[in-house]
Amino acid sequence: IIIANSVDAAGICHAIRLLNPKIKLGTSEWAATERLAEIGGKWVEGITVAQFFDRDSRAPAYLNFRAAYQSRFSREPGFPETFSFDATNVILDAIESQTQNPGQSLKEIVLARQQFNGVQRPITFDRNGDTLGKTFMVRIENGAFAPIRK
């Protein structure tokens, strides 16, 4: 398991594959951007990632976000773009709620409310501020992330 960003993970995969091309590799969601496949090329083929991002989401809010993102940036949004959009909306909702709850911190508002609308699914925070959600297993195949089907 490689815990690194996409650039470092690609380099580590390259070094490992030179030593043992058949070794099974996994990486953290942090590395699971489209840049990993782009930079890593053949060295990252077959790498497995567990992530909360659903590349095949059919949620209407996600499809709208995806279309708007593609129109503006001429490329698909990945997990950083999607989760940044969701995080921004959580904070904006909390700021709006703060006007009705003066004296409460944004953290207190988020933890008290617990659930917010995300573009792929509801965002639920536990009492520690961690999000709860379904995990999607993907693997890089032919230079792209592909879901691992059971």
Report residues per predicted region.
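Extracytosolic ligand-binding ectodomains
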Residues: 1-150
